[in-house]
Amino acid sequence: MTEKIRVGIVGYGNLGRGAELAIQQQPDMELVAVFSRRGKVDTVDPNVTSVHIDEAKNYQDKIDVMILCGGSATDLPEQTPAFASMFNTVDSFDTHAKIPEHFAKVDEAAKKSGKISVISVGWDPGLFSINRVMSEAVLIDGNTYTFWGKGLSQGHSDAVRRVEGVKGGVQYTIPSEEAMDRVRRGENPVLSTSEKHKRECYVVLEDGADPKKVEETIKTMPNYFDEYDTTVHFITEEELKRDHNAMPHGGFVI
């Protein structure tokens, strides 16, 4: 291929770094620039250009597609429609209840600009969706159950960190072993959200933050924690760095 696909990355957290590494493995792609609210960032490849997100509009003739690596809680609802008005885009928006609303906003922006936007192609929705489609195409009689974890949810961890008074934090999704056993036994149970998973949060507070207010805000957060059995643990910054710096995850489609 003589002409490579020119790619930009918006947002440079764990997902943004992963996108950079993935692009490095693709012979038909080149990373033009990383765009971040922080401006200059330390990219995996020090030769990659990184600029402030506000400068993205100046790259419309230099980039073929933008990979949007922000969080679903507050970033992508604003960023994807905005970037779809200037670029072809891809995002991994995963707030399931709000996908129709997100689609409508992005679709409107992309149609006005004549661009193409692909939304919600991450883990779930995304790879797990493909697993479900393949399984249901073969096993047409039955129910499909998805269990996430045990592992660290980057999206829910990001949502925790956006809460006022939170300095740092992570969230672990824990599937119910009892619920999975019932499914594996062929009972075809009807399971509520809270019966399938629990959520555990480990939070570092800002100085002077009210722990009760923070806990209540997390537990009642719509689309993230309000329907789950959620436990909030308050820990020190040292404990967060020592005990929660890995990002394991997994899951089951049954």
Task: Label the predicted regions.
Residues 15:
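Hydrophobic/small residue at the entry helix of a nucleotide-binding pocket
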Residues 12:
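Glycine-rich Rossmann-fold phosphate-binding loop(s) that bind the pyrophosphate
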